[in-house]
Design a protein with these regions (language model features):
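Fe-S-dependent hydro-lyases/dehydratases of central metabolism
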Residues: 1-414
Length: 414
């Protein structure tokens, strides 16, 4: 019988063939902790009685949610993290380089076929390069730090096939939002999403990253893309035989298969305050807005900033609308600075901020008040995420968000 991608990864890791529902213990190739959770992980690690890390080289600590500190208590997280680094000999530490999920692939920490866990729900992002990655809590992370292993239940797989050429103003964000709307917020709970088709093959790794990042919004345990030459170039590696084998077999057993024609996708938005509340942008046109946010681990990459700049070039952000742009990493910031992208955005009236999570998690500037509306490119629009519980958050692609910033209201990108 054939295997899905997730089944191949687990078999390679454990040396045993598996099927959905099996409980197995895997060897963890890489784990990530960010600044929000490091105090809790550190305390739980010592509470469990561990005195040393199983393998310090497999641990990555990234400060991103709270950088730079906007509240007095934020510095406690940094101090706790630095103490942990010094005490246990961590060498992979990033204090201001960008968002954790961007850095994990950008810096080469996760490779195709790896198994990785992180203390953040959007750890599913690394599936963009063909890795099995998922978010966990601080207790599980503390256990991994001490043992190097983690138990998992082998998930069923939902196959998503997308063929054809996308319309000009449609981005991968529109695809994943539509998929979440079709599946609903719990439609893929503890299941793997496996993406294939000509549309996926033609996508950049950055676009795949957007889709893998948001898989959790349908409840998915992970999202997986077959590694290809684009993956190899991005990861700066030559794919080995194992990595080349990470494609779903024709006779693999899937929970179900969802098929789409790329030409049928249109710009969409997730409406307040549910990520699966999806409507076409055309249905929302004319809705006035107060702010636009372009950034996050979902859409803060160079191609996202360039897409926004293409829309904004020669135009101005509407009066009384604030446009905040936050690159996902320092590397992306410098690339966008070097190629003139940031200059176009700044000339249009954008506020360019330091790399990091920024407004996505409601920190370090840009929060809104009662009755205000924001169009944002991040991954969640829950109540209170960007200010008070009476703020309305609409999730969209960078092209759509940029068009809305110019119009001062929700419009289709042109």
């Amino acid at each position: 019988m054939g295997e899905t991608i997730i089944e191949k990864i687990i078999r390679h890791n454990t040396g045993k063939a598996v099927k959905p529902g099996d409980i197995v213990t895997v060897n963890v190739d890489r784990c990530m902790i960010h600044d929000i959770f490091i105090p809790f992980v550190a305390d739980k690690f010592e509470e469990m009685g561990f005195t040393k890390l199983h393998d310090p080289d497999k641990v990555v600590l990234i400060y991103d949610h709270l950088v730079p500190a906007s509240q007095q208590d934020d510095t406690r997280h940094f101090h706790k993290g630095d103490e942990f680094v010094e005490k246990y000999g961590l060498t992979h530490v990033h204090r201001s380089a960008g968002i954790c999920h961007q850095l994990m692939t950008e810096a080469g920490y996760v490779k195709p076929g790896d198994i990785a866990f992180g203390t953040d729900s959007h750890t599913t992002t690394y599936g963009c390069v063909g890795a099995f990655s998922s978010g966990i809590g601080y207790t599980e992370m503390a256990s991994i730090l001490g043992t190097g292993t983690m138990w998992i239940k082998v998930p069923e797989t939902i196959k998503v096939v997308i063929d054809g050429e996308l319309p000009e103003n449609v981005m991968s964000k529109d695809i994943i939002l539509r998929l979440i709307g079709d599946l609903r917020a719990d439609g893929a709970t503890y299941r793997a999403l496996e993406f294939s088709g000509s549309t996926i093959e033609n996508m950049s790794v950055a676009s795949r990253m957007t889709m893998a990042n948001m898989a959790i919004e349908a409840g998915a345990k992970c999202a997986l893309f077959t590694p290809d030459e684009k993956t190899a170039e991005y990861c700066e590696i030559e794919l080995n035989d194992y990595q080349k084998s990470l494609v779903g077999d024709e006779d693999a057993v899937y929970m179900k298969t969802m098929t789409y024609k790329a030409e049928n996708f249109v710009p969409v938005m997730a409406c307040p305050s549910q990520v699966d509340k999806i409507r076409n942008v055309s249905e929302l046109e004319g809705t006035e807005i107060d702010q636009v946010f372009i950034g996050s681990c979902t859409n803060g990459r160079l191609e996202d900033l360039r897409a926004a700049a293409e829309v904004l070039k020669g135009k101005k952000v509407a009066d009384f609308v604030k446009l905040i742009v936050t690159p996902a990493s320092r590397k992306i910031y410098r690339q966008a600075l070097a190629d003139g992208t940031l200059d176009i955005l700044a000339e249009a009236g954008a506020i360019i901020t330091h790399p990091g999570c920024g407004l996505c998690c409601g920190r370090t500037g840009g929060i809104l008040s009662d009755g205000e509306r924001v169009v944002a490119t991040n991954n969640r629009n829950f109540l209170g995420r960007m200010g008070t519980s009476k703020v309305e958050i609409y999730l969209a692609s960078p092209r759509t968000a940029a068009a809305c910033a110019v119009a001062g209201k929700i419009v289709n990108p042109e």
